Amino acid sequence: SKLRLVVGKNSKLLHKPYLINGNEKKIAFDSKLFNELTLTKLFGKLNLKFIPMKKNLLDILRKRNNHKIVRKFYSLEKSVTGEDYKKKINKVKKFLRNRKLDLIFITAPENVAWLLNIRGEDTAYSPIPNSYLLLDVKNNLFLFCDTKKIDKKLSKKLKDINIIDIIQTEEFLKKIKNKKVVIDQLTCSIFFQNLIKKNNIIIEKKDPIYLLKSIKNKIEINNTKEIHLYDGAAITKFIFWLKKNYGSSK
């Protein structure tokens, strides 16, 4: 039988006769790519046993043919964001203090991008930099990313942040003990969730950054209005071209 899996906000299993019929099935999976909520939603009612792979076979193949150009991260100016990253960090620290929590492990890269006012070119047509961030209530910050993507200029801007190569994330998290650590089940993988849970108390909460970044400041609002004008002009030009050239050979 063919198995088709759609992963995302509306994750679902489209064809599953093989999994439904018969005895317990063992499925190998990469625990760094799935969160607990998604697996429960997809397979919760099926007789399955998931076996985490030590190494993702696709990653091994990809490394053999990995000759891509390293594209640097870059920062956005305050004239664009309306707020520097230190003020944003203080808001997250306040969230931790008010709930008497020690740490938050931010695993949604788009939220790391917003918090630190940084962007990247890791994925085509997306400015999101692949990264994680660990922030504690005492103002210690650890950015996990490909360190080759951080140039001297950006490193200077983020001088208050410890930048650690993303391949060291596992070893670093193992050292954290006896803390109350916030994770978002929608974005934190099973691998990291289990790793943190070994020596700490897991607090499952929605990443507070989703709410924080939804509240726009005056500069963001004004920039959105200005961009809307450029966007409207571009659409108008396209519609004009389409009407003028519809049916022609162009």
Question: Which residues are covered by each model-predicted region?
Answer:
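A composition/biophysics-driven feature that prefers long, compositionally simple stretches
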Residues: 1-249
